[in-house]
Amino acid sequence: MKISRSLSTVEVHTGGEAFRIVTSGLPRLPGDTIVQRRAWLKENADEIRRALMFEPRGHADMYGGYLTEPVSPTADFGVIFLHNEGYSDHCGHGVIALSTAAVELGWVQRTVPETRVGIDAPCGFIEAFVQWDGEHAGPVRFVNVPSFIWRRDVSVDTPSFGTVTGDIAYGGAFYFYVDGAPFDLPVREAAVEKLIRFGAEVKAAANAKYPVVHPEIPEINHIYGTIIANAPRHPGSTQANCCVFADREVDRSPTGSGTGGRVAQLYQRGVLAAGDTLVNESIVGTVFKGRVLRETMVGDIPAVIPEVEGSAHICGFANWIVDERDPLTYGFLVR
């Protein structure tokens, strides 16, 4: 056997959504910012992402992150998020997974009852706080990036569902937020094929019609996914939502950055008051909580700083190899 690459990972899930943390095996990443390092990876070593996200090592809905050195003085480490289509700007479920792993595995100095974890991401610095009893990590809350409504009541035309109206909001990534009830889209596992078709059509139409650009981070310049909300299954939940993102990927968690954007959307529309908590349910029934910490501005756009809370669990450790003689060296996808 001729091993051309060996990679080590920690396998975590957040509310059911996989997050594969790559801890070793990457080349040294040039660049003074996480965005620059991500750009270098995309141009020079994208086969690593494909090997870890695609079958047979991964699957069409796989998600993960590369650990890298921090770029800001208060961060413990940096992360580059990756998925089936490429690389993302933010990943709230990934922040929760990374923070849990960092505390459980001793990557940071642990304190009782809560341990702080600082993470540099493409969207900026994220500060998380992990409950720690001296033996086990518990729920994680993180202070999200400034979040805001970019456009209200915008419409797109789709091939299968006609005209769809919603808001475009930002919570670390841009999403098109829409009510699923008028389209008979329950947020349940049994409806996943219809949810995927709807979400993919809306995302494609929205990106074609609305050229979004973050006012302070010009590299964030596309609509990452569609978030479809409807009635929850649990009495204590405010809503359920399903995020269809990247290349028709379905988030099993309630979506961390999407929850941040939803908090901003509801607050700026007067639906969620200061001090209220959004209990956001996923397609599999797991829950994130979100609330507004304070108001702020992003350029000339009114925004809020949300806090998002959820839980993650380590479910494995793995060593992966790439054998250049393998005809499926860097993987494939079957949808």
From Swiss-Prot:
Xref: Pfam families: Pro_racemase
Positions of substrate binding: 92-93, 251, 256-257
Alphabetical UniProt keywords: Lyase
Keyword Lyase: yes
Reactions catalysed according to its record: trans-3-hydroxy-L-proline = 1-pyrroline-2-carboxylate + H2O
RNA-binding is among the record's keywords: no
Secretion signal span: none
A GO molecular function held by the record: trans-L-3-hydroxyproline dehydratase activity
Active site as annotated: 91
The enzyme's E.C. designation: 4.2.1.77
Similarity remark: Belongs to the proline racemase family.
PANTHER family for the chain: TRANS-3-HYDROXY-L-PROLINE DEHYDRATASE (PTHR33442:SF1)
Function noted in UniProt: Catalyzes the dehydration of trans-3-hydroxy-L-proline (t3LHyp) to Delta(1)-pyrroline-2-carboxylate (Pyr2C). Is likely involved in a degradation pathway that converts t3LHyp to L-proline. Displays neither trans-4-hydroxy-L-proline (t4LHyp) epimerase nor proline racemase activity.
Protein name stated in the entry: Trans-3-hydroxy-L-proline dehydratase
